[in-house]
């Protein structure tokens, strides 16, 4: 067991060495990128040892040796939890980061600050591993905020672009909303249970726990881009493609789902929280799948597919199947990272062109990238015996065979079908047909720094699901028998999506252009969500503030109260004092009449 914990700590320690080295010589070392890549590879090999030992012995362990601080009766220690979730996630995250870093050496080779970029990527990975291995909420919060700030720095990497700065700020602001939920939950656990250690929280499980669990759901919704807090995820595509690949596969966006997986002992008997997560996930997975249908930016389509898959993971949490949700996190990481690397290969070769309408015919020019992209799209749809099938199919089976909300199930099945539609759309537009890019474009995919990472992720997208699914302990007894129509539900919906996509593609060649329909506008404008939430409230606030300032300050005080009132008083006074017309005869006559009347009145006998 000592060897077991030592290898886990060694894995984390290895990753810190490039950070220390780069602090002494940040920009001058030309071999720093390959050094970081090799360090991550060594950490990946090291992390396989405790994972294999755990699968062999099936024994969890904790390390809580380093005492930080004692606040009254709260004792904070540096504590690592080495259970199934952390030990399985570490090799997956390290393998994918290793591949992405090698790809970055090709994609970012002309960037003058590439060493700093690699340092940021490594810090992003380290903070995620801190979050995954944390055994108390304080340590988890450090990792949670770490992935947030690193995503801000990486999304806004090209800080000279306004869109990149806006997207980075949007990501951090939406995550602040989620952080409010996590902080509220931490405060509740501290005031009611006087502890932040996970095992003590689970042991002191009180009912009801609706307030802290709702805070955790809010935190997960912010970090994992659930409906309402989702707009930052497609906007994050303004960052470099390696950042998108790392962000969407094994780091930040799955942190929210991982938080709920960590706290599933508190949620497994709470029907209210399960229903909330189920409905939230179902709405997210369908809404983002609809938004993906009409996007033309290849990275935006893949980003919306990520959000849709995160909604599916949230549905799985709502079905009380945390191990299935974790399996989908791991399998999804492989093919999603590969999809982003393939799109990065296409974008880089087409001189930073991201519009799929300006691609086409790439199956001849980029045969290896095309093969990987098609296999990634098929794995995303849950095609049998690819990686996605081993997690997506059991999730749909669990949904159809559990006592769940039929409305949520219908939304999830519809989103599953739409996944096949937008995946087929990428294949049709980007890879098939005639080339629609300039003929002078030079295309080359023969660089080993491009081929090798995609090749590794391609192997993972085919075999990783089988390997990972065979290592999951069955916590809830699965159904041994199922009706045939329920067993084939997921495959049927995927096949239906492919058929719809093929039919639409054949029909569009003969259809005349008309004005966009309302469903098309809804999908293209992202459900009017950015218009309503990003434009309307600021416009109303600014116009109301302007009117209040104009009415109260300008018109009332600065204009009406002082200048106009003073002028009016002076006008009345001058009118009153200078109201003489020069009519002397009339004045004398009035005096005479007045005097005459007075004399008559005084001299009149009584």
UniProtKB/Swiss-Prot annotation:
It comes from Balaenoptera musculus. Core subunit of respiratory chain NADH dehydrogenase (Complex I) which is composed of 45 different subunits. The gene is MT-ND5. GO terms for molecular function: NADH dehydrogenase (ubiquinone) activity. The chain crosses the membrane at residues 1-21, 35-55, 87-107, 114-134, 140-160, 171-191, 211-233, 241-261, 272-292, 301-320, 325-347, 366-386, 413-433, 457-477, 482-502, 582-602. This is NADH-ubiquinone oxidoreductase chain 5. Core subunit of the mitochondrial membrane respiratory chain NADH dehydrogenase (Complex I) which catalyzes electron transfer from NADH through the respiratory chain, using ubiquinone as an electron acceptor. Essential for the catalytic activity and assembly of complex I. GO terms for cellular component: mitochondrial inner membrane. InterPro entries: NADH_DH_su5_C, NADHpl_OxRdtase_5_subgr, ND/Mrp_TM, NU5C-like, Proton_antipo_N. The keyword Mitochondrion applies. It is a multi-pass membrane protein.
């Amino acid at each position: 067991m000592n060897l077991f914990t030592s290898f886990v700590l060694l894995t984390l320690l290895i990753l810190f060495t490039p950070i220390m080295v780069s602090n002494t010589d940040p920009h001058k070392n030309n071999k720093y990128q390959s050094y970081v890549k090799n360090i991550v590879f060594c950490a990946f090999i090291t992390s396989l040892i405790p994972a294999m030992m755990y699968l062999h012995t099936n024994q969890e362990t904790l390390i809580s040796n380093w005492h930080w601080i004692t606040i009254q009766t709260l004792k904070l220690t540096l504590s690592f939890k080495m259970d199934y979730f952390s030990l399985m996630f570490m090799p997956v995250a390290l393998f994918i980061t290793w591949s992405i870093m090698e790809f970055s050496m090709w994609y970012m080779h002309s960037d003058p600050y590439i060493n700093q970029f690699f340092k940021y990527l490594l810090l992003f990975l380290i903070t995620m591993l801190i979050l995954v291995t944390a055994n108390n909420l304080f340590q988890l919060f450090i990792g949670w905020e770490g992935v947030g700030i690193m995503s801000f720095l990486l999304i806004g990497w090209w800080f000279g672009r306004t869109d990149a700065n806006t997207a980075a700020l949007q990501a951090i602001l939406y995550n602040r909303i989620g952080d409010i939920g996590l902080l509220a939950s931490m405060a509740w656990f501290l005031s009611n249970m006087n502890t932040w250690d996970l095992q003590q929280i689970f042991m002191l499980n009180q009912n009801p726990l609706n307030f802290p669990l709702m805070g955790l759901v809010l935190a997960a919704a912010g970090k994992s881009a659930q409906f309402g807090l989702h707009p930052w995820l497609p906007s994050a595509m303004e960052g470099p493609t390696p950042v998108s690949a790392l962000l969407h596969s094994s780091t930040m966006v799955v942190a929210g789902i991982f938080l709920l997986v960590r706290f599933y002992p508190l949620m497994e008997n709470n029907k209210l929280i399960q229903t909330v997560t189920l409905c939230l996930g179902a709405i997210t997975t369908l809404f983002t799948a609809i938004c993906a249908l009409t996007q033309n930016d290849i990275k935006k389509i893949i980003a919306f597919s990520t959000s849709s898959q995160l909604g599916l993971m949230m549905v799985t949490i709502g079905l009380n199947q945390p191990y299935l949700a974790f399996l989908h996190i791991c399998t999804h990481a492989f093919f999603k990272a590969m999809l982003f690397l393939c799109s990065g290969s296409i974008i880089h070769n087409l001189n930073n062109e991201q519009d799929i309408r300006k691609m086409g015919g790439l199956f001849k020019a980029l045969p290896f990238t095309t093969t990987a992209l098609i296999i990634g799209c098929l794995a995303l749809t849950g095609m049998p015996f690819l990686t996605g099938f081993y997690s997506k199919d059991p999730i749909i089976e669990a949904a159809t065979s559990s006592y769940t909300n039929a409305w949520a199930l219908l939304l999830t099945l519809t989103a599953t079908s739409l996944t096949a539609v937008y995946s087929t759309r990428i294949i049709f537009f980007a890879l098939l047909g005639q080339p629609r890019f300039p003929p002078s474009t030079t295309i080359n995919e023969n660089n080993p720094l491009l081929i090798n990472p995609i090749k590794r992720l391609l192997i993972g997208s085919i075999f990783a699901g089988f390997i990972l699914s065979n290592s999951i302990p069955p916590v809830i007894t699965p159904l041994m028998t199922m009706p045939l129509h329920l067993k084939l539900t997921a495959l049927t919906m995927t096949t239906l999506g492919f058929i719809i996509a093929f039919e639409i593609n054949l029909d569009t060649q003969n259809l005349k252009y008309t004005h966009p329909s309302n469903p098309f506008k809804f999908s293209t404008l992202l459900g009017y969500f950015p218009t309503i939430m990003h434009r309307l409230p600021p416009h109303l606030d600014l116009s109301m503030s302007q009117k209040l300032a104009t009415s109260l300050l300008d018109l009332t005080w600065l204009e009406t109260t002082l200048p106009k009132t003073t002028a009016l008083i002076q006008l009345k006074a001058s009118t009153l004092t200078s109201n003489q017309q020069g009519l002397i005869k009339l004045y004398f006559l009035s005096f005479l009449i007045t005097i005459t009347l007075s004399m008559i009145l005084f001299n009149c006998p009584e």
